[in-house]
């Protein structure tokens, strides 16, 4: 592993994007801070950037940089202290027979078809349900860091879920997961996070990075179901108290 003093942070540049419509809070404008150049952001550098609140989309490494808004809060699960609740144990038992296959980033039409079905069912009208093959590949199949693609299949080979995961020096970063939208209450997403937690435990890694949590966004509320959760606030990772979903309505 590269020593932190050897990482090329002094040669990285950071710039702010122009404002664009926020994907999570209606009527808000968002901005991002982008780390460049991408060819210097290897696995070691990216691990350090994630600890500072960055994420990636393809080879685009960014963090929220919005004017007058700090709603996006980076969160991570403390793996060693996690204890599943009753509904999570049900999801674990329900899908324990799924067969997993961990591979390098590869395009398969079967994956792309499942991606479109997922987007159409879960995020219709948001734009991603119209993603071309090229847009899908740029979003999920381009990476300069240590990334894995994980398939989840039934015994008969039916594809149920695909997850893109980055391997960091202190944990796993959940990049994106898409799954069969039918039936709607199958809890595939919950099972996926439980699977990642189990993988991190096996690798003796302390954290699962879940990206950003927004208190006012119902789409993000599932993340607080995985406790204990830490949040990056004012430059420090501190415990995030359990949030009552009713309090955000």
Swiss-Prot record:
Enzyme class: transferase
GO cellular component, one term: cytoplasm
Compartment list: Cytoplasm
Domain of life: Bacteria
Keywords attached to this entry: Acyltransferase, Cytoplasm, Transferase
Principal location class: cytoplasm
InterPro entries in the record: Acyl_CoA_acyltransferase, Asp_Glu_LeuTrfase, N-end_Aminoacyl_Trfase, N-end_Aminoacyl_Trfase_C, N-end_Aminoacyl_Trfase_N
Gene Ontology process terms (BP): ubiquitin-dependent protein catabolic process via the N-end rule pathway
Enzyme Commission code(s) on record: 2.3.2.29
Catalytically driven reaction(s): N-terminal L-glutamyl-[protein] + L-leucyl-tRNA(Leu) = N-terminal L-leucyl-L-glutamyl-[protein] + tRNA(Leu) + H(+); N-terminal L-aspartyl-[protein] + L-leucyl-tRNA(Leu) = N-terminal L-leucyl-L-aspartyl-[protein] + tRNA(Leu) + H(+)
Alphabetized GO MF terms: arginyl-tRNA--protein transferase activity; leucyl-tRNA--protein transferase activity
Matches recorded under Pfam families: ATE_C, ATE_N
HAMAP family: Bpt
Function: Functions in the N-end rule pathway of protein degradation where it conjugates Leu from its aminoacyl-tRNA to the N-termini of proteins containing an N-terminal aspartate or glutamate.
Family listed: Belongs to the R-transferase family. Bpt subfamily.
Protein name (Swiss-Prot/TrEMBL): Aspartate/glutamate leucyltransferase
Organism: Janthinobacterium sp. (strain Marseille) (Minibacterium massiliensis)
């Amino acid at each position: 592993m590269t020593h932190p003093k050897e990482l090329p942070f002094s040669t990285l540049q950071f710039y702010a994007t122009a404002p664009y419509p926020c994907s999570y809070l209606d009527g808000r404008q968002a901005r991002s801070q982008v780390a460049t150049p991408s060819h210097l952001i290897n696995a070691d550098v990216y691990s350090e950037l994630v600890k500072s609140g960055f994420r990636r989309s393809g080879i685009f490494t960014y963090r929220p940089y919005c004017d007058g808004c700090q709603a996006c809060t980076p969160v991570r699960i403390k793996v060693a202290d996690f204890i599943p609740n009753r509904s999570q144990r049900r999801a674990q038992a329900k899908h324990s027979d799924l067969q997993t296959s961990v591979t390098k980033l590869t395009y398969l039409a079967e994956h792309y078809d499942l991606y479109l079905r997922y987007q159409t069912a879960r995020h219709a009208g948001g734009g991603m349900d119209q993603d071309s093959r090229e847009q899908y590949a740029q979003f999920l199949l381009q990476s300069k860091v240590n990334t894995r693609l994980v398939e989840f299949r039934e015994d008969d080979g039916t594809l149920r879920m695909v997850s893109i995961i980055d391997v960091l020096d202190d944990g796993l970063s959940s990049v994106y997961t898409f799954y069969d939208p039918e039936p709607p209450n199958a809890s595939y997403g919950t099972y996926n996070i439980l699977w990642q937690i189990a993988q991190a435990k096996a690798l003796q890694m302390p954290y699962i990075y879940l990206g950003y949590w927004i208190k006012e966004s119902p789409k993000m509320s599932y993340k607080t179901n995985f406790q204990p959760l830490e949040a990056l606030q004012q430059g420090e990772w501190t415990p995030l108290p359990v949030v009552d979903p009713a309090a955000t309505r």
